[in-house]
Structure formats: C-alpha cells, structure tokens
C-alpha cells in the first residue's frame, strides 16, 4: 500500500478540459460514432420486435451472442488495425455499416435481419481504431482531459439522437436507418483524412494545415 500511495505517473495530466484544434478529426468521429451506435442499440432491436415480432427474450440472447463474439474477435480486430492502419480499418467499418443500415431499411426476412444485427455489432468493434488514432497523435499530457471531453461528446449524440429519431421512427422506420447510413457515410469521408502514419504534427492528410492545427 505504501508503494502504491507513492506511485507517480511519468506524465502530469492537464486538469483543464480543453479540446485542441488538432484533435478535430477525432472529436467529429467520436460524435458521429455516438449517434451511429444509438441507432443500433435502440432501433435495430425495435425493428426485430416490431416488424418481425421477434420475442424480446431472443433479442437478449442475440445481445449475449454479440458479447461472446466480441470477446473472441477483439484481439483479432486489434491485430488487424495494427496491420492495416486506422484509416483502412475505419474504412472497412464504415463501408460495412453503410451496407448494414441500408439493408435494415428494406429487409423483409427475419433471418437476414438477425444476420444484420450480428454484423452491425461486430463492425462497431473496429471503432477502437478511433482511439488508437488519437493515442498516436495526442500529446500525452492531453490524453485524460481530451478523453473526458470525447466521452461527453459521444453522449451528447447518444442522448439527443434517439429522441429525434423516435419521431422519425413513428412516421417511417426505414428513414431512421437511411439516416444511420448517412452518418456512416460522413464518418467514411472524414476517416479518409487520417494519414497512413498518424503522429503529432501529422494528424491529417490535409495539406498546409499542420501549423494551424497545432493550436
């Protein structure tokens, strides 16, 4: 206990909550990820239950299957991200999610809907690439404060979007998933700005922005 109480981190984290401009890609991807995930968490289950009369207890079982698959695939996803890089990993995720969300909008088969539900969750596992991208570009002293802000940003979308899309759902449930596909498409475009080798001073592929984004 004495050793633990005297432990000091090598890096002193900044306590003020400040989001630096050079982390703007990370911030936007985090915000979009929060909204995208809520469409899956809330409305994919609604689709199974309301459109296909899928028993609620079976939805719970699918959630457990997803958890088991995630546990098994997580190390493999991590190795894949290390091998192909964050931009390619996120590209794979977002292209997959666009296909899944568009398919949700028009699916007529319960078997296909269940397969989409499982694929949807697995693609979200690749979102860890957003965090590894941030770790590569961040000043170590900024990590704690910026992570706290990103948590808040993620949850702003998580709180606001389900309420708004709930109204859309009543009118046309397909529109909800097409909006989700649009969000995934925006994320796809944004992820293309991630460099092959992200690091401090090389946070984006945009030209002539390195100096301004340092602020």
Segments predicted by a language model, with ranges:
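Short amphipathic helix-loop junctions that connect adjacent transmembrane helices
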Residues: 42-59
């Amino acid at each position: 206990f004495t050793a633990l109480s005297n432990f000091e981190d090598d890096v002193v984290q900044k306590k003020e909550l400040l989001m630096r401009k050079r982390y703007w890609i990370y911030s936007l991807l985090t915000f979009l990820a929060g909204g995208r995930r809520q469409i899956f968490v809330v409305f994919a289950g609604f689709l199974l239950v309301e459109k296909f009369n899928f028993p609620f207890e079976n939805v719970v079982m699918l959630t457990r299957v997803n958890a088991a698959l995630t546990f098994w695939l997580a190390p493999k996803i991590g190795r894949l991200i290390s091998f192909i890089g964050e931009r390619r990993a996120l590209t794979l995720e977002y292209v997959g999610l666009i296909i899944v969300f568009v398919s949700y909008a028009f699916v007529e088969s319960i078997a296909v809907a269940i397969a989409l539900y499982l694929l949807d969750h697995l693609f979200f596992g690749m979102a860890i690439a957003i965090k590894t991208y941030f770790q590569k570009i961040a000043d170590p002293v900024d990590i704690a404060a910026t992570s706290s802000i990103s948590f808040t940003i993620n949850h702003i979308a998580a709180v606001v979007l389900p309420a708004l899309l709930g109204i859309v759902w009543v009118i046309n449930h397909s529109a909800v998933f097409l909006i989700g596909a649009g969000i995934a498409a925006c994320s796809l475009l944004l992820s293309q700005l991630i460099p092959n080798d992200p690091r401090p001073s090389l946070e984006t592929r945009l030209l002539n922005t390195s100096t301004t984004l340092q602020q």
